[in-house]
Amino acid sequence: MLNRTVKEKILKIMELGLEVNSREKNTVFIRFSGHCEIFEVSIHSKGWKEGLGADFFKDIYFGSSSENEAWKKLDEIIEKLEKLKVN
């Protein structure tokens, strides 16, 4: 079960991802698999193009990650999205 802080960070990431995608089509991809507590974010800074990988990718397996490790990864994602939002 995800704790409150993790849920808040995930919601912040979703919000930032939607804001960035409203300016740049197909830039941020976010996936949460609740049945196995996996959260994935991929960012294509210059937009998605077939055959090109993401510039930034993070996946978190909450079931096997320590709380501090998960928070660190979530904070890295938030920082990256906030930079994209400003630019």
Can you name each region flagged by the protein language model?
Residues M1-I38, G47-N87:
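Negatively charged, low-complexity tracts enriched in Asp/Glu with abundant Ser/Thr
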